[in-house]
UniProtKB/Swiss-Prot annotation:
The keyword DNA-binding does not apply. Binds 2 nickel ions per subunit. The lineage of its organism: Bacteria, Pseudomonadati, Pseudomonadota, Gammaproteobacteria, Pseudomonadales. GO terms for molecular function: nickel cation binding; urease activity. Ni(2+) 2 binds at residues 216, 245, 271. This is Urease subunit alpha. Gene3D superfamilies: Metal-dependent hydrolases, Urease, subunit C, domain 1. Keywords: Cytoplasm, Hydrolase, Metal-binding, Nickel. One of its GO terms (cellular component) is cytoplasm. Substrate binds at residue 218. The active site is at 319 (proton donor). Its EC number is 3.5.1.5. It comes from Pseudomonas syringae pv. tomato (strain ATCC BAA-871 / DC3000).
Length: 566
């Protein structure tokens, strides 16, 4: 018996050779592989396959998955494939073909009475986003981020303090302890960065031992060559990452001075274009160094006709500047350059900028990391055409390049890729389901550690789950001890060895960062291009390997107003 390709897609979702449009963009992905055995697909529902003696077998709980996502279209850095995904004990247990091995062939994921089912037919499945530029200004950010599809937040802060409004720093052991304790309340993987701006090792070491998973160098605290050198030395000793916001005013040196202070050691450069801060006008040069792991923040993503205007006011507020002081205004204006922002679009498309993050409430929007990543990808396809690596009629490589920017690459950079950042067996089951029409904008379901933490949900008093008003609501994995079992608090190995979780009474699962100091740009997947960057000091024009980088600002973006009418 045969059915039409359209009927098959309607029933089980797209299969090999089918193409799917991502939201209202011009990006199209094509299914590369389908793990199913045609005719043996499993699907739940009345009169469907996953019933006792059919697709569901008789095995005990130990031998079947806890949760099965059926027939989902996976988009990840490693591929665009159709598969069943099995989850066991909060981790991804299998990617393959589900069913009853007693009666079905080629089953790699056993289904039993202990198995819950989530229908993935016609849905896109991605790893939860990893946002590594968080100012922890208010706890409400965490819900905003979760509902956008972000499941890991890394950064610093203590609340709406003036220092936190400007810098991603949780300074000192006392503040670190309070923030670690607070993080127990949220269905989000969280890691904190300490203050890196000091010229002697002691104050840095005590922060790492208190739980910091990294150290942040910020110009507002004084990012001098001495502070950079000291911070990187401590990071090398304790295997934590260093993030840097460089010296916009070039007071203690120019970009060449800062790059020399790195001494070829690994460092994560925040908003490497410079509008978010950094050596004016040429911090963008840093993306050509093999030891530099470059990221963007989302307000400049992508370059539009409104980008310049909104940035000036943003900057004055976030960095405690006074519009009545001429020097403060000049400082702000030096950071906002059309030419370098336009170049940033293209450098992302070339894979020279490797990551994208938010800069939450401090010149960035915490709920728009994923959306702005795909808006940038769409703008670049429209302006630059298909990438050479893309197949005929699809944007698969571009999709893999861009999804890596907010999933696997930030996870690799901060030493947590053994736990999160991709859909791979053994990793924490932080997964996001999307309807293709709403991809990147509004997820349908967010899983944390294999349990549903948030979802679109209709009227709770209705007779079915779907009546309006439909909006995002926290689900059971956001409450009680389930929250502690399904989310991670990341700390340093030194803090783990010192017994910090026990001392502070932390209840969430503990993740330990590792491998931070050996990462090089060549390790950042699909985003490892090392261009030779030149910036004209008069015109701010940017060239990469001798080629001028310029693109027009967008007047209209996809994934925008038509999705936010209410």
């Amino acid at each position: 018996m045969k059915i039409s390709r359209q009927a098959y897609a309607d029933m089980f979702g797209p299969t090999v050779g089918d193409k799917v449009r991502l939201a209202d963009t011009e990006l199209w992905i094509e299914v590369e592989k389908d793990f199913t055995t045609y005719g043996e697909e499993v699907k739940f529902g009345g009169g469907k396959v996953i019933r006792d003696g059919m697709g569901q077998g008789q095995l005990l709980a130990a031998d079947v998955v806890d949760t099965l996502i059926t027939n989902a279209l996976i988009i990840d850095h490693w591929g665009i494939v159709k598969a069943d995904v099995g989850i066991k004990n909060g981790r991804i247990a299998a990617i393959g073909k589900a069913g009853n091995p007693d009666i079905q062939p080629d089953v790699t994921i056993a289904v039993g009475a202990a198995t819950e089912v989530i229908a993935g037919e016609g849905m896109i499945l991605t790893a939860g986003g990893v946002d590594t530029h968080i100012h922890f200004i208010c706890p409400q950010q965490i819900e905003e981020a979760l509902m956008s599809g972000v499941t890991t937040m890394i950064g610093g802060g203590t609340g709406p303090a003036t220092g936190t409004n400007a810098t991603t720093v949780t300074p000192g052991p006392w503040h670190m302890a309070r923030m670690l304790q607070a993080s127990d309340s949220f269905p989000m993987n969280i890691g904190f960065t300490g203050k890196g701006n000091v010229s002697l090792p002691g104050p840095l070491i005590e922060q790492v031992k208190a739980g910091a998973i990294g150290l942040k160098l910020h110009e507002d605290w004084g990012t001098t060559p001495a502070a950079i050198d000291n911070c990187l030395s401590v990071a090398d000793e304790y295997d934590v990452q260093v993030a840097i916001h460089t010296d916009t005013l070039n007071e203690s040196g120019f970009v060449e001075t800062t790059l020399a202070a790195f001494k070829n050691r690994t460092i994560h450069t925040y908003h490497t274009e410079g509008a978010g801060g950094g050596h004016a006008p040429d911090i963008i040069k840093a993306c050509g160094s093999p030891n530099v792991l470059p990221s963007s923040t989302n307000p400049t993503r992508p370059f539009t006709r409104n980008t310049i205007d909104e940035h000036l006011d943003m900057l004055m507020v976030c960095h405690h500047l006074d519009p009545s002081i001429a020097e403060d205004v000049a400082f702000a204006e030096s950071r906002i350059r059309r030419e370098t922002i336009a170049a940033e679009d293209i450098l992302h498309d070339l894979g020279a900028f490797s990551m994208l993050s938010s800069d939450s409430q401090a010149m960035g929007r915490v709920g728009e990391v994923i959306m702005r990543t795909w808006q940038t990808a769409d703008k670049m396809k429209k302006q630059r055409g298909p990438l050479p690596q893309d197949g005929p009629g699809n944007d698969n490589f571009r999709a893999k390049r861009y999804i890596a920017k907010y999933t696997i690459n930030p996870a690799i950079t901060h030493g947590i890729s053994h736990e999160v950042g991709s859909i791979e067996v053994g990793k924490w089951a932080d997964l996001v389901l999307w309807r293709p029409a709403f991809f990147g904008v509004k997820p349908t379901l967010i899983l944390k550690g294999g349990a549903i933490a948030a979802s679109l949900m209709g009227d709770a008093n209705a007779s079915i789950p779907t009546p309006q008003p439909v909006h995002y609501r926290p689900m059971f994995a956001s409450f009680g001890s389930s929250l502690h079992a399904t989310s991670l608090t990341f700390i340093s190995q030194a803090a783990f060895d010192a017994g910090v979780p026990e001392t502070l009474g932390l209840k969430k699962q503990i993740g330990v960062v590792k491998g931070c100091r050996t990462v090089q740009k060549k390790d950042l997947i699909h985003n490892d291009y090392l261009p030779d960057i030149e910036v004209d000091p008069q015109t701010y024009q940017v060239k990469a390997d001798g080629v001028l980088l310029w693109c027009e600002p967008a007047d209209v973006l996809p994934m925008a107003q038509r999705y936010f009418l209410f």
